[in-house]
């Protein structure tokens, strides 16, 4: 499966931390020859433009924050793009570094996660 030019990074250029991380990790994608399309996230103050998700409660314990809802809408907009265009895409966050060539052996959702908490 080839998705070399269909990688979308969700970023918030209005947020100093998000901009910092995306600027830091983009060279790692360039190193492996990937072009990353920058996708400007849904902002909490623009949530009123979106009303098609029902969030309920987070783990049944609390309401989701406006930032969490905006994150879900950002991903959902890209999933809709994927379905409407019938294209395979990769969706990454602003702080995802590419450390090796991507290998998507199956169609569908592939999750690559690495959480390091030091």
Question: What is each PLM-predicted segment?
Answer:
Residues 1-92, 96-118:
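An acidic/histidine-cluster motif and surrounding catalytic segment
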